[in-house]
Every structure is written in C-alpha cells, then in structure tokens.
Amino acid sequence: MNLRGVFQDFNPSKFLIYACLLLFSVLLSLRLDGIIQWSYWAVFAPIWLWKLMVIIGASVGTGVWAHNPQYRAEGETCVEFKAMLIAVGIHLLLLTFEVLVCERVERASIPYWLLVFMPLFFVSPVSVAACVWGFRHDRSLELEILCSVNILQFIFIALKLDGIISWPWLVVCVPLWILMSFLCLVVLYYIVWSVLFLRSMDVIAEQRRTHITMAISWMTIVVPLLTFEILLVHKLDNHYSPNYVPVFVPLWVSLVTLMVTTFGQKGGNHWWFGIRKDFCQFLLELFPFLREYGNISYDLHHEDSDMSEELPIHEVPKIPTMFRKKTGVVITQSPGKYFVPPPKLCIDMPD
C-alpha cells in the first residue's frame, strides 16, 4: 500500500461532488418513503453545500488571479482559469434549476415544469460549446459532456411532468437507454482488453493490472447505475411496489465506487481556491505533520527479507525525494532505521 501514490493521484473536486450526491440520494429516498418529514430545502442541503464550495472556490481563485498578474504567464494558467469560469457558469445554471425544483415541489408557485427545466435547456448548448473548447485545449469536461448529451431527456421529462405527453416512463427514458447502451459498450471494451492482456505474455504486469482495475471499476459503476434506472422506471410506472430505499441502493453502490476511483484520478483545476498547485502538495505545506505518513509505503511480501538485511553503521542511506518543486522545497522519505550515536569517550591525562 503506497500512501504517497494515493495522495498524489487524489482528485478532491470529484470526491466532493460524488460525496454530496451520495448524501443527497440517501436523504431523497428517505423523504420519498416518508421516513423523514424534512422540507425539500433541507433535503437538498448537500447540493447547496456543493454549489457553495464552487462559488467560494471560484471567488477566491478569481481574487488571486486579479491580485497576482505574474501568475498569468505560467504555462497553462490561462487555460485552467478559463476552464474554472466555464465550470462556474454551468454550476450557476444548475443551481438555478435546483432552486426552481424546490420552489415547485414545496409551494407549487411555478405553474409548469417546462419553466423549471428552462435552466437545463440553456445548460445544454453552453455545455456543447464548452466541450468544443475543451477538446481544442485538451481539457477533461465530464460534467459538460453529461449535460450536453441529455438535452432530449430533459425535454421529455418536462413534457411528461406537465402531462403534455402520456407516454410511460419506460418510453420517456429512451434517450437515457441509448446513453447507457454506449456505456455498456465501454464496459465490454474494457473487459475484452483485460482478457486479452491476461492471456498475453508480452504485456508487463503494471499494464495488465491497470486494465483489470479499469474493467472492474466500470462494471461496478455502470451495472448498478443501470439497475437503479430500471428499478426507478418500474417504480414510476407502478410496476414495482417496494419503497424507494431499495431502488436507490444500486445508485449508492455506483457513487461509492466513483468516490473510490477519485483516489486514482490525476487532474483537477489548480485555480480553485487559488492554491495553484496539486492538492497533495497544498495539504503537505498546510499540515507538515502529514509528511511522515505520506512518505510511508508497505510491502508485506518482502517484510522478512527486508528485516534480514542490515545496513552498515557507517553508511548513510540514500533517501529518495517525494516531490520536487520549482521553489526548491524537497520533501524526503523518512529513513527506516535510526542508529544510536556512540558514547562520549573521556581520556584522563596522567599527572
């Protein structure tokens, strides 16, 4: 278990999003089953926390950008700052939609669901433009892709809720089934490649392990997600009688898996909260005592052999560096052995 690799590849932005979605789905299922009688404004509290962190992070990042013009000449700084602004714009539109949903459910002050879904209708074309910009600048935009491909699904759901169309929910979700079919093909692709790599002797163990991990991750995400959607559609069409909590269980499995995968995803915009560096380096500078734990790795298979090997007393072990930064700060691993210095020798001179 290499804690250094876990911290280096951690993506805090995605972890926050998946954690908020998981907590929101738990509260929503309990509210729909009547187990809790909270207001929907309270049920949406994890969503408000998510959007609040986005707004605060973007505000701090913009302030750092405005007060430090010298940072704008550093590599891909301008591209990352523009990507942050695009993400903030999309999140504000999503926040508007979520506020309208709560207002419609609590007070019914908005007569039509089409008006509630209007922010999502604006999000889709903006997301398409953001995806084009992201492809040109080699940026990963998962949220923008998700919003851009679901425009037809948003329209069908709004029409169904307003009673303009009387289709069953199984037909209303046809765009969703098309998207899930594509994801199932992706899962099949990873499974096939994993099997081929397992049977090939020319592939190194690291590549084989990576493809197997990807295949298992995609299966654990897509299969429970598809199960949740099928159960939800049958529940809405009155073909499934149990409560909403069993329906949401597969969704929780997918979200927990997504949270675990954030520890192996590099990336993240460095301009959130103006930290301008990887989240791991930021934590190590903010909390220096974490360096001792971040530099530890365990190898249970070679523990006995390592114990049998003794280093010479007069030989100073070389300590590999963990991070190298332009500022010249180097964080080194803690040495595995410490040697007691020899006692002080006193020589009495004869009279």
UniProtKB/Swiss-Prot annotation:
Q: What name does this protein carry?
A: Transmembrane protein 185-like
The secretion signal range is: none
Recorded source organism is Danio rerio
InterPro entries, alphabetized:
TM_Fragile-X-F-assoc (IPR019396)
| Cellular component terms (Gene Ontology) | membrane
Q: Which Pfam families match?
A: Tmemb_185A
Instruction: Return the similarity comment.
Output: Belongs to the TMEM185 family.
Transmembrane feature ranges: 16-36, 41-61, 81-101, 113-133, 154-174, 178-198, 212-232, 244-264
Primary localization = membrane
Bilayer disposition of the protein: Multi-pass membrane protein
Has keyword RNA-binding? no
Q: Where in the cell is it found?
A: Membrane
Presence of the UniProt keyword Membrane in the record: yes
* The entry's keywords: Membrane, Transmembrane, Transmembrane helix
